[in-house]
């Protein structure tokens, strides 16, 4: 049976490719390995659940694309806002890599995507939710 560690390793491997790593100015991380003080464009992979003891195994993973906020002047006031254009271009590449991936015996689909604010670190991130359906041990 697979474990969430296996899912994290699979997604990490799919995204640790030059088309991604040379496009961002940060790194690809697993779990809580991302430095707390990172100000880079980083991608973080984590899995939140995976059934055990029976097939098919059903699970959920996240791919979080972090992008530092960008200063913008709105109505004469300087503010930090999401850099949506950069988030979109990185997310496009991540989704493209995920969609073209073939992992024998495993099936995953991109279930949803949303943008979330991390105001404490002055960054926004795109959360890409992945659903797994694993038919083999």
Question: Language-model segments: what does each one mean?
Answer:
Residues 38-47:
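A short, hydrophobic beta-strand-centered structural micro-motif
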Residues 1-24, 47-137:
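Charged, amphipathic alpha-helical segments and their flanking helix caps
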Residues 27-39:
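Short acidic low-complexity segments
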